[in-house]
Design a protein with these regions (language model features):
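Proprotein-processing/basic-patch segments
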Residues: 1-92, 96-108, 162, 169-231
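Aromatic- and Gly/Pro-enriched, solvent-exposed loop/edge beta-strand patches characteristic
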Residues: 109-183
C-alpha cells in the first residue's frame, strides 16, 4: 500500500537484533557453552555426540580391559557437535568427568588416567586447540569382587584462540590409558547427560555409580567451552 506522504520512505529492513549480556560476560568478554557428551546405539552403530539437552545416553558408559605391563590407550572416543553459526573460542574450557575401575575378582590392581582434548574438525582434518591429563589413579579390588572405584575430575583446558566455522565440528576427545597387574581389570568412563545411577556400558556390563555403598557419583560429563564476545 503506498504511503500517503511521498516524502516518507517505506522501512524495508528488519529491526536490529538486541543483544543482552550478563555482568560477568561484560567484564570478562566471554561466555560459556555447556555441552554433554553422549552415545546413541541403534541396530547398526553407536553414534557419539555433544549435546546441550539433557538426554539419556545408551550406553551409559564405555569400558575396556587394561593392558598388562605398560600404559596403553584402551579407550579413544570422539564426541562431535556440528556448528551452524561461526563463533570464536578463547580462554579455558572447564571439564567435569567421572572415570573408574572395576574387577570381578579379589586382589586385582590397575593404574589409569584420562586425557581430554578439544579440537576443531572440518570433516577430514583435526586441529588440536588444547588438552589436559588427569592425575594417575591406582585401583585395588581388595578382598571383594565386582567392586567399583570411581574418581571425579574437575579440569581446566587452556585453548588456543580459534574460529569454528559454519559446517565444521567442535570435537572433544577422551583417551583412557591404563595398565594392570597379572589379572584383568575393567576401566570405565561415563557419559550420560541424564545423570542416571545405573545402566550398562558398551559391553553390556552393568554400571553402578554407587562406590562401596556410601557415595553415589554423577554419571554425566560436562564441558564448558569459552566463547569470545565482541562488545
Amino acid at each position: 500500500m503506498p504511503l500517503a506522504n511521498p516524502q516518507l520512505t517505506k522501512f524495508t529492513t528488519a529491526s536490529p537484533v538486541l543483544a543482552t549480556f550478563s555482568f560477568q560476560e561484560l567484564t570478562s568478554g566471554q561466555s560459556f557453552l555447556s555441552l554433554f557428551p553422549m552415545r546413541q546405539e541403534d541396530s547398526s552403530s553407536i553414534k557419539n555426540s555433544l549435546v546441550s539437552q539433557i538426554l539419556i545416553s545408551n550406553p551409559l558408559a564405555t569400558g575396556s580391559s587394561a593392558a598388562t605391563g605398560s600404559f596403553t590407550k584402551i579407550i579413544d572416543l570422539d564426541f562431535d557437535a556440528l556448528i551452524n553459526q561461526n563463533f570464536d573460542i578463547a580462554g579455558n574450557a572447564k571439564v567435569n568427568l567421572v572415570h573408574g575401575a572395576r574387577s570381578y575378582s579379589p586382589s586385582r590392581t590397575a593404574e589409569y588416567y584420562t586425557i581430554v582434548k578439544v579440537r576443531r574438525w572440518d570433516g577430514s582434518t583435526e586441529t588440536d586447540l588444547g588438552s589436559v591429563q588427569t592425575v594417575t589413579h591406582t585401583y585395588a579390588s581388595g578382598a571383594g569382587s565386582n567392586f567399583f572405584s570411581w574418581k571425579q575430575e574437575s579440569l581446566d583446558i587452556s585453548l588456543s584462540e580459534s574460529r569454528i566455522n559454519t559446517g565444521e565440528f567442535l570435537r572433544v576427545t577422551f583417551e583412557v590409558w591404563a595398565k594392570q597387574g597379572s589379572n584383568s581389570v575393567n576401566i570405565v568412563i561415563v557419559h550420560d547427560p541424564d545423570n542416571n545411577v545405573t545402566g550398562v556400558d558398551d559391553n553390556s556390563q552393568v554400571i553402578n555409580m554407587t562406590d562401596g555403598g556410601t557415595i553415589t557419583w554423577p554419571s554425566k560429563t560436562i564441558i564448558n567451552i569459552p566463547l569470545k564476545i565482541d562488545i
